[in-house]
């Protein structure tokens, strides 16, 4: 299959990435509803709705802010301004959503951990979205640097590159089943989501070194800086994890 994958149906070119992005939101939400019906949710529906609203607002703002900071250079022309408004990243969305949830919980006075129920739907959504990124090839900035490694692929510019989106798809499958196994052990409420955030942001920190980032601060990208901030945010969980394993 040639990348970017741009199918034409009835003379119209289909934006496969956009379709899969919408599908990711839809199936992710349906999976959340499915899980909530089968879970003894200790958070009342009104509070859960407020939490979802906080997550949505935070994710929207976070994804746009980090989308701009990923490459904060633009020109005052119509194309550049349009690209600026369309710039977004899942990393900013996740961390922004996290902050949005915490703010919403402070406002409504909710003290129960709320993230576990969202964890697997989020992974599903990211997975579907990354399929779209992979099929988009070099049209989306999820491709890697040029490489002679055996995993190198022609993603649309006739250069053998690291297929970053494909690496992430494999990682997400592994992470999904690892977290499922942990969940079956009935660990403390809230830890599944925290482990997801720690694992995903740590993975993204290291995988960013394989991307041809142009805007760097002290040798790392803005996404990597966000990853470090997130890992610092969960420093107690990380420390407890190492202490627990050591004992």
Report each predicted region and the residues it spans:
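A feature for loop-to-transmembrane-helix boundaries and adjacent hydrophobic helices
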Residues: 1-247
